[in-house]
Amino acid sequence: MRIASFNINGTKARLPRLIEWLEERRPAVACLQEIKCADDAFPAAEFEKIGYRAIWHGQKGFNGVAILADGVEPVEATRGLPGDPEDVQSRYIEADVAGVRVVNLYLPNGNPQPGPKFDYKIAWMERLRARLCELLEAELPTVVVGDFNVIPEDKDTFSVRAMQHDALMQPASRDAYRRILNDGWTDAIDTLNPRGGVWTFWDYQAGAWQRDHGFRIDHLLLSPQAADRLRAAGVDKEYRGREKASDHAPVWVELADQR
C-alpha cells in the first residue's frame, strides 16, 4: 500500500502536473497540501475521471488539504486540528482508508520569526502532538503525512548557514518535532536514509533546483503498527523538474499488506 504526500502549491495552477503524477505513480492514497481553493472549487470530478475519490478541507487562496484514495471512498474521521476552536485555517484532515488511519497536514511556516506567526506555529505543533498521542493510544495503523515546515536536523538541508535564521530550523521547531517522534512515531524517510541528504523542497528563487539547494520538510510518520509494515519510502524527485512544477516533490511510503 503506497501512501503519498504532495504539496502542490495550488490546485488550479498545478492540476495537469498532479493528474500526470497520479496516473504515472498510482499511489493507493494521495494526500495534498496547499490546494488553495474553497471547498466548492475543488476539482473532485477531475480526480474521479481517473479513479480517485476525495475528501478535502479547503480555504480560498490559502492552505487547504485533501485526501485522495484510488478506487475507494476515504472515510473522513476528523476535519481541522482539535484544540483551538478559534483557529479557522484549513490545515488538517484525517480519513480511514483500507484499515489505515491517514492524517494529512499542512503545518504553519512560522516566518518571520520571532513573532506571532512563529508563536502560532509552535502552539499548532503542541496541539498536533496532543492529537497524535490520542491516535497512538488507539493502537491502529496510522500514517501522518504532509508539509511539516520543519527541517529536523542539519543533515536535512543543503546549507545550515543559509537556513539558520529561518523558522523551519529554529530550536523550538526542531524540539517540537522531536517530541512528537519521541512519543512513538517513526520518520520513514529518515529511518531508511540515516545519513540525510534527501530533499523534498527546492525554492523557485536563486536557481535552487538547478543547483540542488533543497531541504527536507515533507515527512511521513508511522505509528508502531504501521512501522512494522514499512517496506520503502522515497521522493519522486523528477516531478520537481517538470514544467510548471510545484516547489515540492511528492514523497511516499510503502507499507506491506496487512496479514
Question: How should each PLM-predicted stretch be described?
Answer:
Residues 50, 124-217:
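Metal-dependent phosphoesterases centered on the DNase I-like endonuclease/exonuclease/phosphatase
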Residues 1-10, 99-114, 145:
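Active-site-proximal beta-strand elements of phosphoester/diester hydrolases
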Residues 82-83, 108-125, 162-165:
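Surface-exposed cleft-lining segments at the edges of enzyme active sites
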Residues 35-38, 42-112:
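Structured beta-strand-rich core segments of catalytic domains in phosphoester-bond hydrolases
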Residues 61-75, 196, 208-229, 255:
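Conserved beta strand-loop-helix elements of the APE1-like EEP
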Residues 234-259:
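Surface polyanion/phosphate-binding segment centered on an Asp-His-Pro turn
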Residues 1-65, 180, 259:
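N-terminal, active-site-proximal structural segment of metallo-dependent hydrolase catalytic domains
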Residues 3-7, 22-40, 102, 131-154, ...:
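Active-site beta-strand/loop signature of hydrolases that rely on acidic residues for catalysis
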